[in-house]
């Protein structure tokens, strides 16, 4: 079953109100994404994994992935496309603060548009379901960098620049090898398999009762 972005938003809010907090959803989303990635790649021990994160909850999922991948002994670099004080949500802030206590994960911040990495894998946690208007810097340069880099590319929830509701794209967008979205498939995502690559919808523990009156 495919659902709309608004339905997903309402299901998340209802689940949160039931006591299944959004930070639990974020934790389970990041963990499920890493499980899929590790299953695909096999051993990620010592692999250079670069995670681009935006300032919202899509970035927060990427922050959770960073912690889990460090547990697999990957060499993880997180590139936050902005300043930590501008992280938008409590859940993402909470996960950033954990990474700040983890020397095993390299943290980079700021609005740079000059990326000099040699990754084996890139995780796109830049933009999620809240896409609107033209994509600006530093996000645009990060997306360009992802597309120009020869490595395995993994999108969290949706490739950045793809509207998960309509399947339409912004002025710039990522092209990935695998996309893992959460709870249920959003209507627009499967329309662009050329951007998503392999596509999975993973359960993240939201109670089925959270769907009542919405689906």
Curated annotation (Swiss-Prot):
Binding residue positions for K(+): 58, 124, 160
Catalysed conversion reaction: (6R)-NADHX = (6S)-NADHX; (6R)-NADPHX = (6S)-NADPHX
Keyword annotations: Isomerase, Metal-binding, NAD, NADP, Nucleotide-binding, Potassium
Pfam families assigned to the protein according to its UniProt record, in alphabetical order: YjeF_N
GO terms assigned for molecular function: metal ion binding; NAD(P)HX epimerase activity; nucleotide binding
Domain named YjeF N-terminal: residues: 8-212
Protein residues bound to (6S)-NADPHX: 57-61, 128-134, 139, 157
InterPro entries given in the database record: YjeF_N_dom, YjeF_N_dom_sf, YJEFN_prot_NAXE-like
Cofactor mode of binding and number, as noted: Binds 1 potassium ion per subunit.
Tree of life domain: Archaea
Cofactor(s) demanded: K(+)
EC number: 5.1.99.6
Family: Belongs to the NnrE/AIBP family.
PANTHER family from the UniProt entry: NAD(P)H-HYDRATE EPIMERASE
Function: Catalyzes the epimerization of the S- and R-forms of NAD(P)HX, a damaged form of NAD(P)H that is a result of enzymatic or heat-dependent hydration. This is a prerequisite for the S-specific NAD(P)H-hydrate dehydratase to allow the repair of both epimers of NAD(P)HX.
Record-given protein name: NAD(P)H-hydrate epimerase
Organism field: Nitrosopumilus maritimus (strain SCM1)
């Amino acid at each position: 079953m495919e659902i709309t972005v608004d339905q997903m938003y309402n299901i998340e809010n209802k689940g949160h109100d039931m006591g299944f907090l959004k930070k639990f959803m974020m934790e389970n989303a990041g963990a499920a994404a890493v499980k899929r990635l590790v299953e695909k790649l096999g051993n990620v021990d010592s692999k250079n994994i670069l995670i681009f994160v935006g300032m919202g909850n899509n970035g927060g999922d990427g922050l959770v992935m960073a912690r889990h991948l460090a547990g697999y002994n990957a060499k993880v670099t997180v590139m936050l496309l902005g300043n930590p004080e501008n992280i938008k949500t409590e859940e993402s802030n909470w996960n950033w603060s954990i990474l700040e206590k983890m020397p095993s994960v390299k943290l980079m911040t700021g609005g740079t548009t000059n990326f000099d990495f040699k990754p084996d894998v890139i995780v796109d946690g830049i933009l999620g379901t809240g896409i609107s208007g033209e994509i600006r810097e530093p996000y645009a340069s990060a997306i360009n960098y992802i597309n120009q880099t020869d490595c395995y590319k993994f999108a969290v929830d949706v490739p950045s620049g793809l509207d998960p509701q309509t399947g339409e794209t912004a002025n710039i967008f990522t092209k990935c090898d695998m996309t893992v979205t959460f709870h249920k498939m959003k209507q627009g995502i499967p329309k662009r398999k050329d951007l998503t690559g392999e596509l999975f919808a993973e359960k993240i523990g939201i109670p089925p009762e959270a769907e009542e009156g919405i689906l």
